[in-house]
């Protein structure tokens, strides 16, 4: 606290002890005083600490093979997509490492950004791939839905709201947000409604594609801090999108017909080989996708040009769905086993039960996303009863439980203890 000097009512700074005559300004608080020099010093310390914490570091950037191996721990299948994503992400952050799009001191080559387009049906892991990448690299990550976006000035969300989600994910640390990853889902829903340009304005289709162009390429965008529409009397957050990696995904229903028409029957003459539509399944067809197919689908050339990396994810078959249930680090079976373990009960699935769950997911057409819903339905009654019972040691889920809603097998605690004792005696 400031003290009075010998010469009268002379106030002193509570921090450095200088009198009001020795400083330019002395600011009073409730019982304390601070001088302008101490304020400047505090500002310097804070700015130094913030600049150190803000600067994202990519000194130990994992190699593409390491990125792919990390994805293998969480994502089953989709080898082509994982390889393409690993290379694209590595090149993107290597580009940031050497100074972004600026030219290096010993080279005149300018490194451009490579955004990614993921094509594939629902429930195949498009969103999960992007989430897992962001978690590995420890960068801010945001998911946006393209169906909610409209052109500026119309009812709906502006494209800048996507950037606000990323800033919020980075705790409003703009420097960190500028090296983050944004995943835009349902990108196929903003395709132009007709192949020919129309006189009527397409505010949720082509208009949104036009609005996204600059953000995808790299620009300094003005983002309203509270979201919503812009108005001239509000402050904006300035964010540079040059080093933000955009991954966009969509199911692109009907695109396979456009690809088939291009690669289908091209033969001419008696000796030409004709490739019928039956020769290729949907996964094979999508693997032949070209930018021209996306243009026919309704994406504008400028938009497709800003997504140089195009890769596909395939529908999950029965074997892949069973592996998803059991193999990843956070596999669904392990999650539910852990939940039961907290009630001191073992949960067991027979092989045919897992096959039945996978078959149900295929029938519903929901892919891996539907597995949890099926598991919840199967385990609902037993999860309701088990916490209130102390006599159950193990719950066994069989095929009949999944398909016919039969009660699961409950193994009493006494029999489990007796078996364990017999085993110990024989040993």
Curated annotation (Swiss-Prot):
Reported function: ATP-dependent specificity component of the Clp protease. It directs the protease to specific substrates. Can perform chaperone functions in the absence of ClpP.
Sequence similarity: Belongs to the ClpX chaperone family.
HAMAP family: ClpX
Domain ClpX-type ZB residue range list: 1-54
Oligomer status and interactors: Component of the ClpX-ClpP complex. Forms a hexameric ring that, in the presence of ATP, binds to fourteen ClpP subunits assembled into a disk-like structure with a central cavity, resembling the structure of eukaryotic proteasomes.
Binding site for Zn(2+): 13, 16, 35, 38
Protein's recorded name: ATP-dependent Clp protease ATP-binding subunit ClpX
GO biological process annotation, one example: proteolysis involved in protein catabolic process
GO cellular component: HslUV protease complex
Organism, scientific name: Acidothermus cellulolyticus (strain ATCC 43068 / DSM 8971 / 11B)
Molecular function terms, GO-annotated: ATP binding; ATP hydrolysis activity; ATP-dependent protein folding chaperone; protein dimerization activity; unfolded protein binding; zinc ion binding
Record keywords, A-Z: ATP-binding, Chaperone, Metal-binding, Nucleotide-binding, Zinc
Highest taxon listed in the record's lineage: Bacteria
Binding site for ATP: 121-128
Matching CDD domains: RecA-like_ClpX (cd19497)
């Amino acid at each position: 606290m400031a003290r009075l000097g010998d010469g009268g009512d002379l106030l002193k700074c509570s921090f450095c002890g200088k009198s009001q005559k020795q400083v330019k300004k002395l600011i009073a608080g409730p019982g304390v005083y601070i001088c302008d020099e101490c304020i400047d010093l505090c500002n310097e310390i804070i700015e130094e600490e913030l600049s150190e914490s803000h600067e994202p570091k990519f000194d130990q950037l994992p190699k593409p093979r390491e990125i792919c191996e990390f994805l293998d721990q969480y994502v089953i299948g989709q080898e082509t997509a994982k390889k393409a994503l690993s290379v694209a992400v590595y090149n993107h952050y290597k580009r940031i490492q050497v100074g972004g799009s600026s030219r290096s001191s010993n080279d005149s080559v300018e490194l451009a950004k490579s955004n990614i387009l993921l094509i594939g049906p629902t429930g195949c892991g498009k969103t999960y791939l992007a989430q897992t990448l962001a978690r590995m690299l420890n960068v801010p990550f945001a998911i946006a839905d393209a169906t909610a976006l409209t052109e500026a000035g119309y009812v709906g969300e502006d494209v800048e709201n996507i950037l606000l989600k990323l800033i919020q994910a980075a705790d409003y640390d703009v420097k960190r947000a500028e090296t983050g990853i944004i995943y835009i889902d349902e990108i196929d829903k903003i395709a132009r409604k007709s192949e020919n340009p129309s006189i009527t304005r397409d505010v949720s289709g082509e208009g949104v594609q036009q609005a996204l162009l600059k953000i995808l390429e790299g620009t300094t965008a003005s983002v309203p801090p509270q979201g919503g529409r812009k108005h001239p009397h509000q402050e904006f957050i300035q964010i540079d999108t040059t080093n933000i990696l955009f991954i966009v995904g969509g199911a692109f229903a009907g695109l396979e017909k456009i690809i088939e028409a291009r690669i289908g029957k091209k033969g001419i003459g008696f000796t030409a080989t004709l490739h019928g539509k039956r020769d290729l399944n949907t996964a094979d067809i999508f693997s032949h996708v070209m930018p021209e197919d996306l243009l026919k689908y309704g994406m504008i050339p400028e938009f497709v040009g800003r997504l140089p990396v195009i890769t596909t994810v395939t529908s999950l078959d029965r074997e892949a769905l069973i592996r998803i249930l059991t193999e990843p680090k956070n596999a669904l079976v392990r999650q539910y086993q852990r939940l039961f373990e907290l009630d001191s009960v073992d949960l067991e699935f027979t092989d045919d039960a897992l096959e039945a769950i996978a078959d149900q997911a295929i029938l519903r057409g929901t892919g891996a996303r539907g597995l949890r819903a099926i598991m919840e339905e199967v385990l609902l009654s037993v999860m309701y009863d088990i916490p209130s019972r102390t006599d159950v040691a193990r719950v066994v889920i069989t095929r009949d439980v999944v398909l016919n809603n039969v009660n699961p097998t409950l193994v009493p605690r006494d029999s489990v203890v007796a078996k364990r004792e017999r085993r110990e005696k024989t040993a």
